Design a protein with these regions (language model features):
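Helix-to-loop junction immediately C-terminal to a conserved catalytic motif
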Residues: 40
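A short, proline-enriched helix->beta-strand linker immediately N-terminal to the Walker B motif
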Residues: 155-159
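Conserved ABC ATPase signature
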Residues: 136-140, 144
Length: 273
């Protein structure tokens, strides 16, 4: 995966078990967001592949790809919502899979007594937004909009959740609520991959992968993230630790690096390499 002469991602291999909870950390520009864009096919690979159930994601038909995407829920730092619509409709889009089902949206608009409207209200209440279903999304704060995005995941109930820096622009209360909700979805069976900059949040995950300059340099328990390793991960990052460890503190990651990129997830298996 390249954006210039230097590869944005190189020699990345990740294997994720169904139902696993995984955090991806690294300095700004380490390749975290690029990895997530590749997994959602938002950007094209220059080499390697992404496969679903053994089939290359880049060779699937539009219909087949749509079926895969219905199983994947996404949440981003920049809220992927329609700001002009009420919060409740943005949540409902998680169930209908986009703007295609106008009938479902009209059902919601028909009134607060409809079954869908009640379910949306209950979901928004679960994320701390009771009574906001008919509030225009653009009129909500940034933290509230992120909660709307999480509520949409609750309605969608995806098998795989890809969360790209979901806490970067929200307040501590929202961070805690969003984290708890994502973990609840994970406990209910969803596989959870979260791209993070905050190591303190990453320590709540049983497994952490660290990228630096597009390559994996750590894959394991957060308990093994020593200050020396964190210094190497965040070297040169104004939001991380500037010092780079001495060569003797660097560690062998050959066990975690095979090929160029590979991801395996879910009952059918999702992989990229």
């Amino acid at each position: 995966m390249r954006f210039s002469k230097a590869p944005a991602l190189e020699d990345v291999t990740i294997e994720v078990e169904p139902g696993e909870r995984l955090a991806v950390i690294g300095a700004s520009g380490a390749g975290k967001t690029t990895l997530f864009r590749v997994l959602t096919r938002s950007v094209a690979l220059t080499s390697g592949r992404i496969a679903v159930g053994g089939r290359d994601l880049y060779t699937l038909s539009k219909k087949e790809l749509k079926g895969v995407r219905r199983r994947v829920g996404t949440i981003y730092q920049a809220y992927n919502l329609v700001p002009q619509l009420p919060a409740g409709i943005n949540v409902a889009l998680g169930e209908v899979g986009g703007m295609g089902s106008l009938k479902t949206l009209r059902t919601f608009l028909a009134g607060p007594e409809s079954a869908l409207a009640k379910r949306i209200e209950e979901t928004l209440e679960r994320v701390g937004l009771a009574g906001r279903a008919r509030t225009r999304t653009a009129d909500l704060s940034g933290g509230q909009q992120q909660r709307v995005a999480v509520a949409r995941l609750l309605v969608q109930r995806p098998e795989l959740i890809l969360a790209d820096e979901p806490f970067a622009a929200v307040d501590p209360v929202t961070t805690e609520r969003v984290t708890d909700t994502l973990f609840e979805l994970n406990d209910e069976g969803a596989t959870l991959l979260v791209n993070l900059h905050d190591v303190n949040i990453a320590r709540r995950f049983p497994r952490v992968i660290a990228l630096r300059e597009g390559r994996p340099i750590f894959d394991g328990s957060p308990e093994l993230l020593t200050e020396e390793k964190l210094s190497r991960i965040y070297a040169g990052d104004p939001y991380g630790t500037a010092a780079d460890p001495a060569p003797e503190t660097q560690y062998d990651v050959r066990r975690h690096v095979e090929g160029s990129a590979r991801l395996v997830e879910g009952r059918d298996g999702i992989s990229a390499h």
